[in-house]
């Protein structure tokens, strides 16, 4: 048996419109403006693109590979995550992390470190198979497999990643009528 409720169509239409409006609303500005530590480290490293390579340089106008890593973490306030700057070479950073934080290619996250040549070269993992490091041509973004030295390891630094936002269903407006047969 079918019953007609006066005004039900208008109410259902209004509820649907409200649901669509609420679910299409952008994320709150506070959440969008709160970058993770990893994105801060990466943004600082990216800002150095094009700076020249110089052996032993730690910035801000020239870098070697470990100098870029140390500078990026230091400027982001995360130097404690990579040994407080006490490890000044790629091989020293590799030795520091070798037994503390190795991770796999599939589990590596942006902000982790990438090591090539058993510690002869180091960079920052950007995600998607890409890294940023200081090559002899300067600070560059490149594929992890583009470095001529053989890949050695991904190293987990513990840099904070923003969690993915959970999917929350839109609330049903109060006073809604659910009509069932």
Feature-to-residue mapping (PLM):
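Bacterial N-terminal signal peptides
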Residues: 13-23
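Extracytoplasmic low-complexity, Pro/Thr/Ser/Ala/Gly-rich segments
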Residues: 34-49, 53
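Generic helix-packing signal
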Residues: 42, 49, 73-76, 115, ...
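Aromatic- and glycine-rich peptidoglycan recognition patches
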Residues: 2-12, 26-27, 31-33, 86, ...
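Generic alpha-helical structural context detector
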Residues: 13, 43-46, 70-74, 133
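Catalytic cysteine-centered active-site loop
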Residues: 51-110, 151
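Short beta-strand segments that buttress and anchor functional surface loops
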Residues: 111-118
């Amino acid at each position: 048996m079918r019953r007609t409720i006066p005004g039900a169509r208008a109410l259902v239409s209004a509820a649907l419109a409200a649901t669509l409006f609420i679910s299409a609303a952008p994320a709150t500005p506070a959440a969008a403006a709160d970058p993770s530590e990893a994105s801060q480290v990466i943004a600082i490293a990216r800002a150095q693109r094009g700076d020249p390579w110089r052996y032993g340089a730690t910035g801000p106008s020239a870098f070697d590979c470990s100098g870029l890593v140390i500078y990026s973490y230091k400027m982001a306030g995360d130097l404690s995550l990579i040994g407080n700057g006490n490890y000044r070479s790629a091989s020293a950073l590799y030795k520091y992390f070798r037994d503390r934080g190795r991770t796999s290619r599939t589990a590596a996250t942006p902000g982790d470190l990438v090591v090539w040549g058993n510690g002869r070269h180091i960079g920052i993992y950007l995600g998607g198979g890409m890294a940023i490091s200081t090559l002899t041509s300067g600070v560059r973004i490149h594929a992890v497999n583009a470095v001529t030295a053989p890949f050695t390891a991904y190293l987990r630094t513990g840099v904070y990643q923003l969690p993915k936002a959970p999917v929350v269903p839109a609330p049903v407006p109060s006073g809604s009528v659910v009509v069932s047969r």
